C-alpha cells in the first residue's frame, strides 16, 4: 500500500447515531493519514456534503432514516463511484444487507458489536483505520472495474435445479484464501468452476454472523453445493466449504478422505479464520495433491502458507495486482516467490480446471 503514502485522505462519516459518529471521528482522526472533514446524519445530508467537500472515502451506516444506506449506496455508485466502507450490525439481517452492499460496490465493511458499542468499536480502532485507509487508496479505475464486474454478475440468472452431487472422495484438494475484496473475487472464481472438481475449502476474513449468509448466497447462485464448514465435515467432490467466522478452518486426512476441523485457537495475523492456518494444515494433509489460490486482501495472511504449499509441491496461484482490490496478501506471496503463477482473477478458474485435468485423482 505504498502508493499514496504521505497523503492525507478526507473522510465523511455517515451515520444516524450521534454516538457512533463521535466514536468514528475520534478513531479515524487518530491516524495522520486521515482527516474527517465532516459527518452526516442521513443520506440527504451526505449527498450535499459529498458535493461540497469531495471526500476521498466515506463510512456509511447500513440502517438510516429517510433513505436506507443500501439505496443511497446504489445511487452513489451509479452517479459518483467512490470508496465506501459500510458500518453494519452483527445480526443475520445486518449480514444480508451488508453482502448486498458489497455487491452494489462497497469496498469493505466494519461490524458493530451488539452490546457495549463504545468499548467494542474502540477495540477495533486499528482495523477501522486500516480498512478506511485501504479503501481510500483504491484507484478510481479499479472502482469502475468493480462496477463493471458487478453489473455482469447481476445480469446472470440464479441457478436452476442443480444435479445431485457425487459424494466421492478424492486425493486432490483446492484451497482459496482472501480478505478485502474477496467476497466478490470468490464469487467470480467459483462462477467459473464446475462440480467435476475436488472439494474446495475457503478462508475469507469475515465475522461470524456473515459467513453463513455468504455461503447461503453462493449456494443459491452456483451449480456446486456451497456450505459453511462444520467440524468433521467430509470434503467431497463438487462441494465448497466456507470457514465460519470466528473459527479457524483446518483440513485433516482421515483414512482415505479429507475432513474439516474447526478451532477457536487464538487469531493468527490478527485473523480468525486465518488463511495461513488453512494453508498450513493442507501442507500436512495433502501436500503436492493440493492447489491453492491467494486472492485480493489487505495484509500478508496466507503468503507464508502459500510458500509452504509451494515448497511441498502444491500448485500455487496469486491474484495479480491489476485485478486485486487490494494487492496486500497476494503481493506478499509474490515477494516470497510463493506463486507458480500470478494471474488476473478472470484467468484463475481456467488454471484450476487445467491443473485438475492434468492431475486427476
Swiss-Prot record:
It is found in: Cytoplasm. The keyword Cytoplasm applies. Residues 10-127 form the Response regulatory domain. Pfam families: CheB_methylest (PF01339), Response_reg (PF00072). Involved in chemotaxis. Part of a chemotaxis signal transduction system that modulates chemotaxis in response to various stimuli. Catalyzes the demethylation of specific methylglutamate residues introduced into the chemoreceptors (methyl-accepting chemotaxis proteins or MCP) by CheR. Also mediates the irreversible deamidation of specific glutamine residues to glutamic acid. Contains a C-terminal catalytic domain, and an N-terminal region which modulates catalytic activity. This is Protein-glutamate methylesterase/protein-glutamine glutaminase 1. It comes from Hahella chejuensis (strain KCTC 2396).
Amino acid at each position: 500500500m505504498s502508493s499514496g503514502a504521505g497523503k492525507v485522505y478526507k473522510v465523511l462519516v455517515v451515520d444516524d447515531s450521534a454516538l457512533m459518529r463521535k466514536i468514528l471521528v475520534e478513531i479515524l482522526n487518530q491516524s495522520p493519514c486521515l482527516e474527517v472533514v465532516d459527518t452526516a446524519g442521513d443520506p440527504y445530508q451526505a449527498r450535499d456534503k459529498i458535493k461540497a467537500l469531495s471526500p476521498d472515502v466515506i463510512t456509511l451506516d447500513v440502517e438510516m432514516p429517510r433513505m436506507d444506506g443500501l439505496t443511497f449506496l446504489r445511487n452513489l455508485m451509479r452517479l459518483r463511484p467512490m470508496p465506501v466502507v459500510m458500518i453494519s450490525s452483527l445480526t443475520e439481517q445486518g449480514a444480508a444487507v451488508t453482502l448486498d452492499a458489497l455487491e452494489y460496490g462497497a469496498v469493505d465493511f466494519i461490524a458493530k458489536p451488539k452490546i457495549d458499542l463504545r468499548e467494542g468499536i474502540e477495540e477495533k480502532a486499528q482495523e477501522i483505520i486500516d480498512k478506511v485507509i485501504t479503501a481510500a487508496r483504491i484507484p478510481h479505475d479499479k472502482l469502475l472495474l468493480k462496477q463493471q464486474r458487478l453489473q455482469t454478475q447481476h445480469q446472470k440468472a440464479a441457478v436452476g435445479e442443480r444435479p445431485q452431487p457425487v459424494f466421492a472422495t478424492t486425493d486432490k484438494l483446492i484451497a482459496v484464501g482472501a480478505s478485502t475484496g474477496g467476497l466478490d473475487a470468490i464469487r467470480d472464481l467459483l462462477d467459473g468452476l464446475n462440480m467435476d472438481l475436488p472439494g474446495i475449502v475457503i478462508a475469507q476474513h469475515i465475522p461470524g454472523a456473515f459467513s453463513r449468509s455468504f455461503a447461503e448466497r453462493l449456494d443459491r447462485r452456483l451449480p456446486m453445493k456451497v456450505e459453511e464448514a462444520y467440524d468433521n465435515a467430509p470434503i467431497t467432490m463438487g462441494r465448497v466449504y466456507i470457514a465460519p467466522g470466528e473459527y479457524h478452518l483446518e483440513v485433516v486426512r482421515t483414512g482415505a478422505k479429507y475432513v474439516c476441523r474447526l478451532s477457536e485457537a487464538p487469531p493468527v495475523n490478527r485473523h480468525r479464520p486465518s488463511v495461513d492456518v488453512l494453508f498450513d494444515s493442507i501442507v500436512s494433509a495433502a501436500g503436492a495433491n493440493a492447489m491453492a489460490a491467494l486472492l485480493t486482501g489487505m495484509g500478508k495472511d496466507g503468503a507464508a502458507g502459500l510458500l509452504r504449499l509451494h515448497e511441498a509441491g502444491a500448485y500455487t496461484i496469486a491474484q495479480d495486482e491489476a485485478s486485486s482490490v487490494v494487492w496486500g496478501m497476494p503481493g506478499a506471496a509474490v515477494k516470497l516467490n510463493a506463486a507458480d503463477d500470478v494471474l488476473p482473477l478472470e484467468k484463475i478458474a481456467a488454471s484450476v480446471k487445467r491443473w485438475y485435468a492434468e492431475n486427476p485423482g
